[in-house]
Structure formats: C-alpha cells, structure tokens
Amino acid sequence: LSTTPEKKPAKRSSKIKIDPNNRIVIKGAREHNLKNVDLELPRDKLIVMTGLSGSGKSSLAFDTIYADGQRRYMESLSSYARQFLGQMEKPDVDEITGLSPAISIDQKTTSHNPRSTVGTVTEIYDYLRLMYARIGVPHCPICGREITQQTVDEMVDEVMKLPERTRFQVLAPVVRARKGTQAKELDAARRAGFARVRVDGNMYDLSEEINLEKNIKHTVEIVVDRLVINDTVRGRLADSIETALAQANGLVVIDVIGGEPMMFSQSYACPEHGISVEELTPRMFSFNNPFGACEKCTGLGTFMKVDPARVIPDKRKSIRESAIKASGWYYAEGSISEMTYKALGKRYGFTLDTPVKDFSKEALHALLYGTGDERIEMQRESMFGSGTYFNQFEGIIPNLERRFRETSSEWVKEEIALVMSSEECPACHGRRLKPTSLAVTVGGINIADFCDKSVNEELDFINTAKVSTRDEMIGAPIFKEVKERLGFLKSVGLGYLTLSRGAASLSGGESQRIRLATQIGSALTGVLYVLDEPSIGLHQRDNDKLIATMKRLRDLGNTLIVVEHDEDTMRQADYIVDVGPGAGVHGGEIVAAGSVADICKVKRSITGAYLSGRKFVEVPETRREGNGKALRVVKAHENNLQDITVDFPLGKLICVTGVSGSGKSTLVNEILYKTLAAALNGARSRPGQCEVVEGMEWVDKVIGIDQSPIGRTPRSNPATYTGVFGDIRTLFSNTQDAKMRGYGPGRFSFNVKGGRCEACEGGGILTIEMHFLPDIYVPCDVCKGKRYNRETLEVKYKDKTISDVLDMTVEEACVFFANIPKIARKLQTLQEVGLGYIQLGQAATTLSGGEAQRVKLANELARRDTGQTVYILDEPTTGLHVADVHRLVKVLDKLVDAGNTVIVIEHNLDVIKRADYIIDLGPEGGSGGGAPPAPPPPRGGQ
C-alpha cells in the first residue's frame, strides 16, 4: 500500500443543473438535528448522501424523504387496511414535492427464520414449485418407476386385494385442509342426495346443521358408500368409486375400518407398490406447507438433539468440579442432582471426585441415557430427616430433550439449546420435503437436487435440460423468469450461492445484494429506492458489482438515494449531497451538493478534503513486532472453512479480509471469539467447529464488539449503557441536600418509583393514540419532559439538576465533571470515539448503527485492561465517514500500544493499511472460499 494518498482526478465541471420538471424538492426539513434544510435532488439518478456519523444523513434520507414517501402511500389505503399496517409519523418537514413510492433496502432486515432460504427470499423457489407442478414427472418413491394415470378398474383391483369381509367406506374428499365454513360444498352434497359427511375425522349427518369455524382449516369428505369385501361387491364398488371421483375432481379415499386408508387418483399411481400420487400442485413442493413438508422434521431439514460433548465439555473434570454443564444438572451440595449422582456412583462405581474420563462405559451411558427399567437406590436427606427409596433414572439427555419439547418457557428452551446441536433429519436427509415430492423430476433431477446446485450450475442446467416439446412450450414462461432471476444473482456476484442456503447464514453484504437483485427482477420503474450503506461488508471487488447493480436499477427509470461513505460509490454517483459540517448539533446542514468536483471545491466540506487528497489516513512508518506469542485456530471446519489452521499473533492490530462469503465471520466470530469467551469469560455460547484453539493461556479476557443496538427502548441511553449514569446518581445522592432529605442513588433513577415523575413514569413524554392518525408524542404536562418529580429536581450539583445533566452533550459533560475522575474517564472515552455531540440521555432508539457500536467501544475502553486482552470488532467502520475512520484508527492504536491485541474484520483500505498483520481468506465466496490464507509478507502485511 502506498504511503502517499492517491489523488484520483476529479472531473472539472460546472455546477450540475437539475431539470425543474424532474426533481425532488425538500423544504424546511427539521427532523432530529436537521436545521431547516432546503434541498433539490434530480430524479432518476444515483444520489449519494454522505457526511460524518451523526451529521444528519440518515435523518434526511430515511427519516424525512423515505418516511414521507411511505406515509403518503399508506394514507392512500383504506382505514381498514391501515389498522393492520400500523401508523407512520409525519416527518418534521414543511413540504416535499416530486416524491415517488419509496422502498427501503437496508441490512437490518435479514431473515433469521430457519425456514427462509435464498430461494424463498428471492422468490425463485416459487417459480420452481410452479415448474415442477406443471412439467414435473412423478416417480414411485420406492422403486423409482415413472408413475402414470390410474383407471377405475385398476383402483377396484387394488381395493379387492383387501382380506375377505373387510369393512370400508368410499369417501369423496371435496375439501382438503382449506379455511372457511365450507357451506357451499355441504349444500352441494345435500342437493346431490348424500346422507353423511366426514369433517376433520368426525362423522356428521347431512340432515343436521353443520357449523364450521371460519378461520380454521377443514377437510370435508362425502361418504359415498359403505361396503364389505366379498365376491359380489366389485360392480357396486366401481360405481361408487366413479361417483366419488366425479365429486372430488378425480380423487377417492377408501377408509378401511381398523386399517390404513387408501387414496387413489385418476392422475398418477405406481402399479407395483400401489402408491398413488395426487395431481401435482405447487404446494406439494413447499416445505412450509403440510402437503409438501417432510413429516418428521416438518420441513426444517434438521433436528435439534442434545450433544453429549456439550453436556460434558471437559471429561478431565469430576462431577464436583462441575464437569456437567446442562440446565438443571449443575452440581450443588444438597441438591437433587447431587443425590442422583451419589446414587449412580454407588451403583456404577464412581465418586463425585472421579474424573469423567475414568468412568466405565456402562456408568457414562447410565449417567447420560438413564438406567432403563432398573431402579436404583436413592438416599434423600433434608432438614426433616433422611429416607431411602428406589427409582428409575431417566438420564440427563432424555430429561433435557423431554423438557425442551414440553416447556412453554422461552428461557428454559434457550438454556437447554446451549447443549444441543443441529442434526440432519434421518427421513428426508436435510431435503425438507416428503418422499412423494422428492420423487418428481424435471430433466432427471428433483427440486431439492436443483436447489443444492450453485446459481452458476443452475443456469447451465436450465439452458441444457432436455424436456419434451410439449413441456418446453408449457414451461417456457417459467424458464424465462427463473433464468432472469438467477442471472440477476450472478450479476451481483452471488453465483456461488445455492438456493437451499439458509437466509440466516448469509452475511450482511450477501443479503443486501440479494434484495437488490430481487428489486431488479421486479423491474419496477418510477420508484424511489433508499439504501443504507450497501457497501458494508463488501470486498473492493464485490463493490464494483454492487455499483453496477445500482446503476442498472437507476437505468430502469428509478431514483436511488444511497447513504454511503465509500469513495468508489461517491465517484460513480450522478449527484452527491454532503451533510455536515460536523456531527450532532454541529451538523444538520447541507455543506455541498453536486458532482465530486463541486464537493472538492468547498473548503468547509470534510468529505471534499479527503476526496481531493488534502487530508488522508497515513500509513505507519513501522509495524509493531508483537509479543512473540500467538493464538492458533487448528483445523477450523465450520460452514465453508476447509480444515484451515490460522495464527493470530498477539500484541498486534490484525485485519481479517476476504471477499464476501469467504468465511471471515465464521473464523473470527463463530470459532475464535466464542471459544475464547467460553474459556475465559465463562460464556455459554456454542463455538464453531475446530480441532482446538491453542495459546489461550497468553490471554486473560476477550471482548467482542458487534453491530447490534445498545437498547430497543427509549429508556436505554448512552449514560445507562456505559454505567456512567450510576456514578452520576451516586454523586447527586452524596450532595448535602440529598443527604438531608435521605435520598439514595435510586431516587435519581427514572426507571423506578420514588424520584421519577409518575405521570409519564420517567419517560418525559406521553403517547396519545390517534387511532387512524399517527400517534402523537407530547412532553409530559406534569414534569415538562424532565422525567423527575419536583422534589428530586430540587437537588442540584453545581447548579444543575439530574435532568439538566441528561440533556448535556458528552462534550459539555466532560467539562462539567472534569474533577470527578471516575465519571470523567468514562465520558472521555465517548469523546475519543467521536461521540462528543450525542446527549447523555439520548434514546438508544435514535442512535445510528455506527453510533451504537462506538458507544460499546467506548464502554470497553473505559474498563481497566491488563495488556492481555483480545478485542474483536466486526466491521468497526460501519457508518463511519473517512474522518471518523481516522479517529477510530487512533483509538485502536491506543489499545494495541497498551499491549492488547485487536482483531478486526474489515474491508476499509484505510484500516487495512494501518494493520500489523493481515489474514486474507478466499479466494472466492461460498464453496469457493474458506481455503487456508496465504502467509503474510515478511513485514506483516505491508
């Protein structure tokens, strides 16, 4: 990396002229910190909004422009529809004209539902279900023979194979698992002269009134005939089957009394095994529908089973040394678990101090899986005396699995889930569907095999698949849609993904690009897209594909507003808006707007200073040598990692890089962090799979700083999260006035009764429900928004009340509490990470992702470190302007200079060039990634 800034030539142009007939005009925007902003934006262009973190970019793009576009659309709906959609508050703006319907694409909406896959998220799977339903060839799931249509004679022959004198009834399934009262079908059955009907397994006489619940799925079967197998029944049976087929669109059910029911279809059946396949419908291929989902795993493809290795993670320990780490089975003196362990030890020859590795095979099996029918002697002691009784022992693992199934407590489920692992379903082998659905093929492969191919392979298959001329004509429109959507995924660099990949396992960059590809596939025009930092998590190579995708969306006739700090995106944009000049109260203005050249000319634009090369992040003259010790992850094989062994040298700033999907988060977050957290911090998270992590003796603690919010309610704020508010409350309780009144620290909390205003319960605002209008938030009439009651506000420190302190910015509070070291140190760290502009009492819900992450970083910086701490940060430059990145790098340097180790997953070149050591994973994403990293150059990645 060069030690001098690269100055890309800025195209010199006059100020961009905006067509007055094709523009978006914003007047008087005052949302959050915006200062009465007036702005004109060109329509049908790629617009980038940039500026320091907290400058007001998101307030303008999302909370003003997008919010108003969405609100206007919702207000056009009926009041009946609006009650299900919730209300959107009108942004604080005088007027916006030229708006289109708005769609937001951010990274916070990745699905964590285990049923969501790449195929379902992109809606490609819906087209595949239709394709297999229309041109699929059914086969017998047992013998694999192609299934053809059945005639009435073949159905009669199959029924006549039943033993002599077998009683059965012929049913016509007119409704199958469908919501509604089914009154129309029941009336039709009455008019046709039928006497009985079976509804949801219960028999009814059609002469009586049958009332069915409207919102529950029902199955309705008309009883056509009741028969007994004998030599004379064949003719009547044939007539009854024909009648049932006519009533139920080619389906008939033979309900054998005391036996298994038989279903026949005029459509398809295997003559050898008698397996009938009903008419192929799209729902047969849905793993989210009972008609298609595997019955054993209900369409998940996996089972959660208790893992013995997680129940006893370290067999070198004894039971008394807490070898058993499972909910309800921790060792404690006087507990039922201790009594059970003693009884098992007496029977199988071990004590509470015997290491588990020395247990006999029989003893370990009894401990984990129970004693079966054998009763063992239990000795129970209590304050009322002792007693002996004999009882069977269920076993730790069966006990945990039973409690997991039966409990209604989410907390208990989460506790037990810590010792469970996911196993492939033995029935469908992870394919999610019923055998009959998996036995349908197109071009020789079933739908699960198709989805297991990569996007690139699927495109090749569709282009070369051999189908009949008739099927080709029927499937042509479906092939076209599938090919287009697969092509869009390939064009955004996701050709390595499979459609069966779980959506929850996707990285932020992958999920963002999938949603972009889906929008291109929808081919909408005249839409306003608002994107939140789409380059987050993207390697420079992937970024080029992303920019091309956004341009393609623009070329369809849409307007794109992108909140972004990436330099390449800015240089490729049609129009740039720089919000600033500073952050918080120092921002909220339009510093510059126009082309890159226009931005570079504006002296007060910090963005312009970096784009023009006047400012830059320096490359260090020397690299740190570290302390000579290292953490080593041996043979990591979680997700796509290919048994790689990686060294993390201690005492250095380490960057883990690689293209999107190459395995960075798996290696660092899932394996290294979770293993260290379990060993050093006592965390109970489940680490990813590797042989061992060596070198943990050189580290005393690990701290992970992720991108999740610091709180989800307005009551959470930076002061409460960092703990500084506790110190401030203690300070107020130590004032002379507070002592005279007998006030403790709790009096100054707005979350508990005593000192808070009870009218608003310490919130400072009241919510007024307006039903079909947005809720209105007004300051509390009693406390005037100050959160506390009058008596509490009479206590002051340096002429400031506790409410005044919450309203201070970090910058102001640093000066105010300069003489209180405990408070000043915590506030100073907030200032160091660039959060001097936020208020101490600012609601967590109003903080951006970048701000929330830096609050966490400041919180960790304020703690005392020993110089042997490992800090792990995932994309710390998220939401950061290059000026903020400059400041962040200095903070990270400070941590490493104190002897600590900082490991960052990062694509930002300004951070990478400051690293002492670089680990580059790849070479590709998905199955093409996870390969052993190349050894760094002699100077540690310069």
Predicted regions mapped to residue ranges:
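Conserved phosphate-binding elements of NTP-dependent enzyme cores
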Residues: 1-942
